Amino acid sequence: MAASHSFAFVVCVLEIGALTAGPTPSYVHEPIQRSDPLQPIDCRMSPWSEWSHCDPCLRQMFRSRSIEVFGQFHGKSCVDALGDRRACIPTEACEDAEEDCEKDEFHCGTGRCIKRRLLCNGDNDCGDFSDEDDCETEPRLTCRNREVQESELARTAGYGINILGMDPLATPFDNEYYHGLCDRVWDGNTLTHYRKPWNVAVLAYETKIDKNFRTEYYEEQMQAFKSIIEEETSNFNANLALKFTPTEAKASKAEEASPKNKSLDDNDKGFSSKFQFSYSKNETYQLFLSYSSQKEKMFLLVKGIIQLGRFVMKNRGVMLTNTFLDDIKSLPTTYEKGEYFAFLETYGTHYSSSGSLGGRYELIYVLDKASMKEKGIELNDIKKCLGFDLDLSLNIPGKSAGLSLTGQANKNNCLKSGHGNAVNITRANLIDDVISLIRGGTQKFAFELKEKLLTKAKMVDVTDFINWASSLSDAPVLINQKLSPIYNLIPVKIKDAHQKRQNLERGIEDYINEFSTKKCSPCQNGGTALLMDGQCLCTCPFMFEGIACEISKRKLA
């Protein structure tokens, strides 16, 4: 299919990786006798610092503390705030920066300055519609009679990441600001013209899909876990430290700026999180880590990626949300760890200067290796039954709009004769669990898949992938991005901009060092420590288990 065609095209990629640890011997538990049984380690914090001086502009004073030791071995986790604030009466005057608009500009109710030519054009240029309040005549619509829709891909453009894997609560970009322009972009999948926001330099609807599912299987749990979290932390975080639950105080209106308010689910604390279907990230990883390799489990990872479009953000003159600007102004000029950590947990440590949008389909099948061996079932038999050995084809719509994928699991492939008996793979207790790490898609699909997993349905197959893919255009997420530090977005005109930029640089470095596995007790017998939401965990080599990898397993003669 020619790339010059006006409709979307397909890039076919074949990538099947297989990582194995060789044949698995049978073991029996034989715990090593210990004279010093492991005791729970509770989170230990440093004492609070002294209160800072009273900030004359914020009329607040601050203090902070540090984490000395993380919880471990079922001890209390470190989930309390590291920063504190209280109101105060300043002893010096606040030197506020002048923020008057130019003569040819209109001063919005939000404090934003816009050109007067943008008044009464039907667009929400101010962010609170105050530019549309006093119109003596009918608004002169920017797009006039041209058909155009708001783009979900464009709303998500620029979204960032947190270096520890947490989903930011808000975006810094106002991607519903158009600067009086009506730049339209055609989407061949939905047969719709979408409006390109002012902040987005390039918006292109280009559909690409892996022709084949990428499958990987692991016998070592730690290998599988590293493969999963590499994408969550974008390879920034090398010390296996993950933090999914915000712990610092948040700006009250920051969530309102987030495009994820249209997304699927909420995490444990009630904040909007990024399109997780079955569980919060914390619950998902805890569930995965509850399956140990020593119980003769095998982990099959199935991945499929669909790209719907790509974007490039402008590198200057962008329109930031009012809440983002207010939160920058609310940062103290002196470095206060808790306040800067809160900002990073709200907006992320980095934003996306360019990237692609769509969805990432990722499932972990926990397989019972002993049962597979007993029934004569191989890994390829399971992949074939689930339909993950099939080629996918993308149909370009004609008269009817929408992304159309074809691919069908053949249930006859789920029957296999082995060891003298016919085995039905779907009913043979070969798949212990299916763990979802899917990103993107609408609420309807989320509920359907969640219900399927909660009923312990093991047959999440290629048909579910097709259903998910059809919902992506309504709820895309970032699947690939080029990142830039969040402090690059601080406008130079803001008071103390240079000092706050330096403070944010320091804050990112401190954030990484604060939540580090260096504050965990060592795991025994070659185990690897990882940190998840304030609790240190041990993942063990194949021949050991236990909360510290302290239990040996000896091979049967």
Swiss-Prot record:
Residues 1-21 form the signal peptide. GO terms for cellular component: extracellular space; membrane attack complex; other organism cell membrane; plasma membrane. Residues 520-550 form the EGF-like domain. Residues 42-95 form the TSP type-1 domain. Phosphorylation sites are present in the extracellular medium. The chain crosses the membrane at residues 236-243, 270-277, 379-386, 387-395. Residues 99-137 form the LDL-receptor class A domain. Belongs to the complement C6/C7/C8/C9 family. This is Complement component C9. It comes from Oryctolagus cuniculus.
